[in-house]
Amino acid sequence: MGVSDVFAVSGALEVVLEGVAGKGVMAVVYGSTRTSTIPGISIAGPSPEATLYTPTLDIEYLVAGRPLTLDVVPVSPEGVPTPAVITRAVARAFNIPLLPVDAGSWTEARVPHAKLPSRVTGGRIDVEPGLPSGASERLFREAYMLGSSLARGLDWIAVGESIPGGTTVAAAVMEALGYRAADLVSSSGKDNPRELKKRVVAQALSRLRECGARDVLEIVDCVGDPVHVSIAGLAVGAREAGAFVILAGGTQMGAVLAILSRLGMLDPRSTAVATTKWIALDRGSSIRGIVESIAPGLTVAAAGFSLEGSRYRGLRMYEEGYAKEGVGAGGSLVISLLRGAGVREILEAVESEYGRLLGG
């Protein structure tokens, strides 16, 4: 029970166990990229265009218990519910404070949240810059200030994400910064559209010369999105304020690590990745391969939590390879398990929350 239900994909689990002792908070940085509207790239919404609204709906549901902008809970075309169901259930059951951070949503969430002043929706990276010139530097700086302020007096801070299309953009960022990634990132779908992603990444990389990118943040302007660079800034600010940093997400956290590594701001001793077993054991991607190429020795912890025995079909579909991770789900699971929660307790909390959702 608890600690025994978390396993190390790489690195030492003890690092995370010590890191999550004491007080902490989970920030969820969210935003949109038009890359998600490329047909087949993301199933984090009922249609490609609907994926632009998913981060806002995720956050509204996370905070208010239901979406407010549209009267629809984010689901895949197959009806698989957003991973925010897991995050909300676990955070409420095991007292994990949540702070949504808007880095560039398509439409503003109608719940209390932090807003980065330079927030901006990302472009479609195969045909246009990911961000306006200078946006990455501004977002990094603003998120750094937020992380520095937020982490004062805390022992740890976890940072999740919500950005459909994020794994494709993350692959482009990692490749542009010199790391192999295009065939290693995961997908929210059961079948990873690897060839499509590689094609989009190649088109984005072909524009680097056109962008005139000369440094790390200019490269992110060219092929990135608002979320990964904001998480990077927040992580540095929090770490320098004395908090242990948990990157609560899947393979796209590799883009955060790549940005930090190329900026010379990555500290594997005070940073870890926490994710779900659905990412850790995914045969269509390799979070271990990504992290070990960027930050050898950095710990990746995964929650052994399963939904196989759930009475709800929508939740059991996670075991078939759908959704896998997002909105801090893996981080919330790892943190709660390491702090003594049991998998049965968590399953009851998740099923109770999903049942409430279905009941309206």
From Swiss-Prot:
Pfam family, one: DBI_PRT
CDD domains: DMB-PRT_CobT
InterPro entries listed in its UniProt record: Nict_dMeBzImd_PRibTrfase (IPR003200), Nict_dMeBzImd_PRibTrfase_arc (IPR002805), Nict_dMeBzImd_PRibTrfase_sf (IPR036087)
SUPFAM superfamilies: Nicotinate mononucleotide:5,6-dimethylbenzimidazole phosphoribosyltransferase (CobT)
GO molecular function, one term: nicotinate-nucleotide-dimethylbenzimidazole phosphoribosyltransferase activity
Signal sequence, start to end: none
Recorded family membership: Belongs to the UPF0284 family.
Protein's recorded name: UPF0284 protein APE_2029.1
Native species: Aeropyrum pernix (strain ATCC 700893 / DSM 11879 / JCM 9820 / NBRC 100138 / K1)
